[in-house]
């Protein structure tokens, strides 16, 4: 059982993440502001690592006409996102899986916050390329990466 399929881990995800990442809500707002500078008011936004729904919640409140594709490999985390979003979940298409099996788009914008560290290093570049391939030309992309020290 992975941590994202363990019911106790899933239920405490938001609280733990907010403790581990000071200013998390500000990161979500800043990412939304950056996307809004270039994305249309009716944008279709790709959200990679959407499980939990934290950034989807902030983005959907900031931009009431945006629609989203939320991609996450964990069904339990996507269920958590649906619950967190309430009525705003109607503006989200949820995709259980990884980016390579997600719809092609094209999307008006994309966001990937604190997700890449869950992937092995070789998979990170592949994931970033898959996101870029799904964006319209010139579309904004905001990423934030959580890095851990490595022993050498």
List where the protein language model places each region:
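A short acidic, Gly/Pro-enriched loop at the edge of an enzyme's catalytic core
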Residues: 102-110
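Conserved beta-strand signature within the Rossmann-like core of class I S-adenosyl-L-methionine
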Residues: 138-145
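Class I SAM-dependent methyltransferase SAM/SAH-binding core
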Residues: 44-46, 52-101
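A short glycine-rich, Lys/Arg-flanked "PGG" loop and its adjoining helix->strand segment in the class I
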Residues: 125-137
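N-terminal, positively charged/glycine-rich alpha-helical extensions of SAM-dependent methyltransferases
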Residues: 1-12
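Short "lid" loop at the C-terminus of a central beta-strand within the Rossmann-like core
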Residues: 146-150
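Conserved alpha-helix/loop element of class I SAM-dependent methyltransferases that forms part
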Residues: 23-41
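Residues lining the SAM
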Residues: 112-116, 144
């Amino acid at each position: 059982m992975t941590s994202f399929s363990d019911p106790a881990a899933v239920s405490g995800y938001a609280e733990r993440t907010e403790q581990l990442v000071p200013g998390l809500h500000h990161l979500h707002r800043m990412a939304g502001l950056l996307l809004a500078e270039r994305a249309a008011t009716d944008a279709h936004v790709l959200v990679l690592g959407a499980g939990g729904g934290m950034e989807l919640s902030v983005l959907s409140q900031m931009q009431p006409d945006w629609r989203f594709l939320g991609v996450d490999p964990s069904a339990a985390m996507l269920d958590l996102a649906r619950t967190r979003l309430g009525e705003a979940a109607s503006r989200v298409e949820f995709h259980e899986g990884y980016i390579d099996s997600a719809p092609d788009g094209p999307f008006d914008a994309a966001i990937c916050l604190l997700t890449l560290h869950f992937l092995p290093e070789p998979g990170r570049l592949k994931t970033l390329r898959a996101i870029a391939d799904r964006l319209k030309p010139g579309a904004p992309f905001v990423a934030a990466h959580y890095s851990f020290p490595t022993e050498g």
